[in-house]
Amino acid sequence: MIVFGSPHRYVQGPGVVALIGEELVRLGRSAIFVAEDGIWRMISAQITASCQQAGVAGQHVRFDGEVTRAEIDRLYAACVSKVPDIVVAIGGGKTIDASKALCTRLRARMVTMPTIASNDSPTSHIFVIYDEDHRLVAVERMPANPDLVIVDTVIVAQAPAILLSAGIGDGVVKQFEVEQCHRAGSNNVFGGRGSIAALALARACYDTLRRDGSAALAAVARGTPDSALENVVEACVLMSGLAFESGGLSICHAMTRGLSAVKGPAQALHGLQVAYGLLVQLELERREAAFIDDMRRFFAATGLPVSLGELGFNGTSADVFTIAELTVQAPHARNFERSLVAGDIVAAIEAVETGRHLAGVA
């Protein structure tokens, strides 16, 4: 059985925040805007004017920065007395996840407005919840994907370049993970088989990022969107998001379980973690040295890590084994063409760190 899921509508371009009123009125007449205070101050005037013109009543609810049960309860208490038709998340991944949790409790329509392109959470129905010490406590799901994703590339172009690098890292891995899921016969996050469309999107995402990644980072350095940035934002947010949910994930994302358990890598952005995970996965796939070396050059050109040290790691061999052990315990590690043990991950990490590739090793 094939299952493919996606947002109902996706809008991207320079200045599209001014269109939010006419987009929201398709979904309802009242909205809660969940955003950190700094983000809200930056764009509230445009949103308010657009909503007033469209006849959409809006209210800002402050997001305090962490996706905890307590924060979700606080957000819920702020709007439960007058339940809105729509919850609009404005900001990064944490704001979006907290808003997804709120939307699920309110049974409202869901809109995401990412202000950065560091990951593909805006299109997905999945959200994560942490405890007060930032330990993962739950991975939960909305009943469906967001009703609308709206991405203003003028705003994205003004964010720090490292955030776009992280988005490139999160996107570039998807082709290889979806391909592994196909080879392993694994299900996607919807519980069905990955489709030809999901694989095509993953490959288009990779091709776009390889072609336009460096130019898009140059656009961010200038603070002005251009065609390269438009292409890369579409790849990082839309193509990558559709590919991972409908195609599946593998070793790159399994590595985040291990990397998040050791000092240094644990503090790295998700997209940087999974990018390093791709180098490990390519070694496990026994890719040719020339292919891996080419990937490493692309990583260096786009601000992605080519070693554990570049993720902030300064640990021991015992820490490397911890990374490996937690990686093979992650559910996504089963989505690989053969069964793996911790020793396989250690060997692949050592190959990445030393440059002594595993291709041709029995």
PLM region descriptions:
Residues 17, 40-44, 94-101, 119-123, ...:
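Short glycine/serine/threonine-rich phosphate/pyrophosphate-binding segments
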Residues 189-301:
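Active-site segments that bind and position negatively charged phosphate/pyrophosphate groups
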